Swiss-Prot record:
Pfam family, one: Cytochrome_B
InterPro entries, alphabetized: Cyt_b/b6_C, Cyt_b/b6_C_sf, Cyt_b/b6_N, Cytb/b6-like_sf, Cytochrome_b, Cytochrome_b_C_euk/bac, Cytochrome_b_N_euk/bac, Di-haem_cyt_TM
Similarity comment text for this entry: Belongs to the cytochrome b family.
Any further remark recorded for this protein: Heme 1 (or BL or b562) is low-potential and absorbs at about 562 nm, and heme 2 (or BH or b566) is high-potential and absorbs at about 566 nm.
Designated name of the protein: Cytochrome b
Binding site for heme b b566: 98, 197
SUPFAM superfamilies assigned: a domain/subunit of cytochrome bc1 complex (Ubiquinol-cytochrome c reductase), Transmembrane di-heme cytochromes
Cofactor note: Binds 2 heme b groups non-covalently.
GO molecular function, one term: ubiquinol-cytochrome-c reductase activity
Amino acid sequence: MAPNLRKSHPLLKMVNNSLIDLPVPSNISAWWNFGSLLTICLLTQILTGLLLAMHYTADTTLAFSSVAHTCRNVQYGWLIRNLHANGASFFFICIYLHIGRGLYYGSYLYKETWNTGVILLLTLMATAFVGYVLPWGQMSFWGATVITNLFSAIPYIGQTLVEWAWGGFSVDNPTLTRFFALHFLLPFMIVGLSMIHLTFLHESGSNNPLGIVSDCDKIPFHPYFSLKDILGFILMLLPLTTLALFSPNLLGDPENFTPANPLITPPHIKPEWYFLFAYAILRSIPNKLGGVLALAASVLILFLAPFLHKAKQRTMTFRPISQLLFWILVANLLILTWVGSQPVEHPFIIIGQLASITYFTILLILFPIVGALENKMLNY
């Protein structure tokens, strides 16, 4: 009998073990769709980004015009740009839901998978940041200036570091050129990290909503979950195309329709919506270094998740108090996102400070305490 090429060919064998014959817990819900959705996001972004890069000029005098030219004169250039800009938003929606799923169902106990995931998040944030600078509008320029300037808060080497990153004494042509180079490079780094992420995941196998060992009840990925994932693709690509075709500038900043001008500062400098929660935490601390540390901690705190797990049960499925706390955390993040978009004045300052304190308190103090409390409750 001829050998099955899918199972014997060195390359096809890897694809087969990852996407076809992969044993998957039979009870995973739609919350497990986001890994494949993120893959689709990444591929879409790389494809549209490559097409945009063919028409883009990384020069301060030409960048803005080259983007306008792409939208006006290139065949479907407007669509490619709108898909790329809004695709970033959907990328972040998916990754935040993916992380939320991981926190809720205790997936962070697969430490290697979780840690590579957090590194992926940081890389994605860096990619989105440098990408936002490329159109060279007002918000691009001032966003780059404000965020890179934060590194000057690092004692002793800060100022040198910032000037080294800028390639001069202010954000200028060298900065734009290197940001374009980085924006082109980082997505491929994300692809590599995703493969590592997937390798670690397939070492242990997927978690499931019950958080119990599922070795006795697994089914092949194809056709069951490959088909289920296609539903997810449709449910994501439909709103993405709707947004890109009907309201492409809904999530953008009107300031970015004005070419960058170092002599005029916009009244409210703020990042894209997906960074607002971290931006609100940064702004809530009046000290520069303190703000930078809080900003870093707001994301790096995810590395601590496995060590803060004190519950005997893995998931929150049967832990009602932890569930309540989790949804309070979600609401808190939405409040932070809203506050980050508002001007720095009363009452937004105090709301931001309270929400920032709540964010760290829930993650660092309340989750472990409630986990231990629920362990006690299991004994009664």
